[in-house]
Amino acid sequence: MKKLAILGVTVYSFAQLANAATLNVKSYGTTQNGQKVDLYTMSNNNGVSVSFISFGGVITQILTPDAQGKQNNIVLGFDDLKGYEVTDTKEGIHFGGLIGRYANRIGNAKFSLDGKTYNLEKNNGPNSLHSGNPGFDKRVWQVKPLVSKGETVKASLKLTSPNGDQGFPGKLDVEVIYSLSDQNEFKIEYKAKTDQPTVVNLTNHSYFNLSGAGNNPYGVLDHVVQLNAGRILVTDQNSLPTGEIASVAGTPFDFRMPKAIVKDIRANNQQLAYGYGYDQTWVINQKSQGKLNLAAIVVDPKSKRTMQVLTTEPSVQMYTADHLLGNIVGANGVLYRQADALALETQHFPDSPNQPTFPSTRLNPNQTYNSVTVFKFGVQK
C-alpha cells in the first residue's frame, strides 16, 4: 500500500490490483467542539464508489452507474458537516450514520440486566430510540486504511464507549470495517467487546433512493422490493414491539414476491398507520444463523439499478422515510419528503432486553459481538 499526497488529498494506492484502487482522504471540517473530521472515498474498478466521514461513520455518498452507465448518488445526505452535526441531530433522522449502542427502540427507555435496572434517554415518546443523543452517529471515529487480498479497498473505524455511556453498563470497544470489492459489494463488518455484561445492537442508517436523490418525483414509491421474510414484529402505537410475531400473509407487509412499495403503503392497516408508512421489523428467513442470508432485493424500474442486502442479523427494519416532511434541505438543495428514500436497517430485534422470547442481545466480557451486512449493487438486464 502506497501513500501519496496530491493537492492536499491523501491517496492510498492498493497496487496488488491490475487497476489500482484508491482510498482518497481529505478534510471535511471540524466539529463544533473543534474535532477534525475527514472524508474518505473508496472506489472500485466498475464505477462504484462509497464516501464516508469520520464523524459518525456517516455514509455521505454512494455512486453507482445506471443501465446507461450514468453515475448518481443513491443515498440521502447533506452538503457539509453542519448538516450532519446540527440539522440531523435536531430532526433525529440519522442520515447514513452508525447506530449504537442499541439500534431501534427500547421500551420505557430502560432494561434490567442481572437484577439491575439501567435507565436510558427517552427520546421517542416513552421509549429510547437509537440510544438517545449523542449516539454513535454523532461522534468522531478513529479511521485507519486497511488492505486485504481479494478486496479492492478497506477501512477500519474504531470507537470506545465508556462505562455508563448512554446509560449502558460496561466499556464497549467497537470496530466497524467498511470495504468495497470489485464485485460491487459494500460490506459492513461490526465487532465489539465489553469489560462487563451489557447489551449491543449495531446498524447503519443509510437512506437509499436508487434513482438518485431528487431524480424521481415518486421518490421510492415505484421501487420494487422483495423481502426474504414471512413474519413481522407486531408493534404498539409507539412502534414498540408487543412481543407478538405475525405472519405477513394477506397483509400489506407481504413482500415475499417482488412488489412496488406504492401498492400497499397507504392500505387501511393499523400497523401501517402507526408508522405513517412502512417502519416495521421483518424476521429474516435464515438458512443458518451467523452466516450471510439474503434479506432484501430492491429494483428501481427507472434507472434499472438493483441492490441486494445480505446479513448475518435475524431481522431487517424497512423504513420508507415517512417522517421526512419536506422541511429538510439536503445535498444539492434537494428538499426531502415522505417516501423519498428507503432504509434497510439490519439488526437484532428491537426491545430484545425487555422481551425474553426474542433472541438475546447480551454481550459478556468473554465474547465478541460480530455482525456482517453486505449491500451488493448492480443493474437489471
Swiss-Prot record:
Major subcellular location class: periplasm
GO biological process: galactose catabolic process via UDP-galactose, Leloir pathway; glucose metabolic process
Keywords: Carbohydrate metabolism, Isomerase, Periplasm, Signal
PROSITE patterns linked: ALDOSE_1_EPIMERASE
Keyword match Isomerase: yes
Keyword tRNA processing: no
Pathway as given in its UniProt record: Carbohydrate metabolism; hexose metabolism
This enzyme's EC code(s): 5.1.3.3
Any matching Pfam family: Aldose_epim
Membrane-spanning ranges: none
Active site feature: H205, E345
Residues annotated as binding substrate: R105, D279
GO cellular component, one term: cytoplasm
MF GO annotations: aldose 1-epimerase activity; carbohydrate binding
Signal peptide: 1-20
Localization annotation: Periplasm
Reactions this protein catalyses: alpha-D-glucose = beta-D-glucose
Function: Mutarotase converts alpha-aldose to the beta-anomer. Active on D-glucose.
Protein family per UniProt: Belongs to the aldose epimerase family.
Name listed for the protein in its UniProt record: Aldose 1-epimerase
Organism: Acinetobacter calcoaceticus
